[in-house]
């Protein structure tokens, strides 16, 4: 798997009752330069999830973007997604890698636990996610992940790193400086009055940091 795909804004879909609005919002993020999208849906029925995931697959292909599915290997296979993201209770990473094969992306939630990130990397994870890096309305009980985790991971692990939790344009730069390859954002992106402009602003943070 080409890990150079794993850099920049990582848009995680919000819970939307309106599927058409969800697709329009994701399209706006892609138009703003976002190239990694995770479909996460805790509310819809399975038929709705399949339909939305298929539509997102078509949309991300149009923008040459990466589509990951949250917590569902079967759905990822069904829609030919680029990979999956698994939490600590969502399945064995070694088994997931065996099912996915070598060319799909496997991401793992590691919270504030560097040992978990080491284990995930050994199991074949392409990226490890630390968070919440800031207080998060989506996961208010999440452990606090410090920037030191990203510094250490960059030095010691082959896997890319993802920051998640309470990220905004204002508090994002220290995470990139510390070594975060991906910034996973829900609220600050999809609640923005102009999603395309907000996505573009996040992408510029990476361009400026690596220029």
Swiss-Prot record:
Family: Belongs to the thiamine-phosphate synthase family.
UniProt pathway: Cofactor biosynthesis; thiamine diphosphate biosynthesis; thiamine phosphate from 4-amino-2-methyl-5-diphosphomethylpyrimidine and 4-methyl-5-(2-phosphoethyl)-thiazole: step 1/1
Gene: thiE
Domain of life: Bacteria
Positions bound to Mg(2+): 71, 90
Cofactor requirements of the protein: Mg(2+)
Catalytic reaction(s) noted: 2-[(2R,5Z)-2-carboxy-4-methylthiazol-5(2H)-ylidene]ethyl phosphate + 4-amino-2-methyl-5-(diphosphooxymethyl)pyrimidine + 2 H(+) = thiamine phosphate + CO2 + diphosphate; 2-(2-carboxy-4-methylthiazol-5-yl)ethyl phosphate + 4-amino-2-methyl-5-(diphosphooxymethyl)pyrimidine + 2 H(+) = thiamine phosphate + CO2 + diphosphate; 4-methyl-5-(2-phosphooxyethyl)-thiazole + 4-amino-2-methyl-5-(diphosphooxymethyl)pyrimidine + H(+) = thiamine phosphate + diphosphate
An example Gene Ontology molecular-function term: thiamine-phosphate diphosphorylase activity
EC number: 2.5.1.3
Binding site for 4-amino-2-methyl-5-(diphosphooxymethyl)pyrimidine: 38-42, 70, 109, 139
GO CC aspect terms: cytoplasm
Protein known as: Thiamine-phosphate synthase
Pfam families in the record: TMP-TENI
GO BP term, pick one: thiamine diphosphate biosynthetic process
Residues bound to 2-[(2R,5Z)-2-carboxy-4-methylthiazol-5(2H)-ylidene]ethyl phosphate: 136-138, 166, 186-187
Record text on cofactor binding: Binds 1 Mg(2+) ion per subunit.
Keywords: Magnesium, Metal-binding, Thiamine biosynthesis, Transferase
Function, as annotated: Condenses 4-methyl-5-(beta-hydroxyethyl)thiazole monophosphate (THZ-P) and 2-methyl-4-amino-5-hydroxymethyl pyrimidine pyrophosphate (HMP-PP) to form thiamine monophosphate (TMP).
Keyword set includes Metal-binding: yes
Top-level EC class as recorded in UniProt: transferase
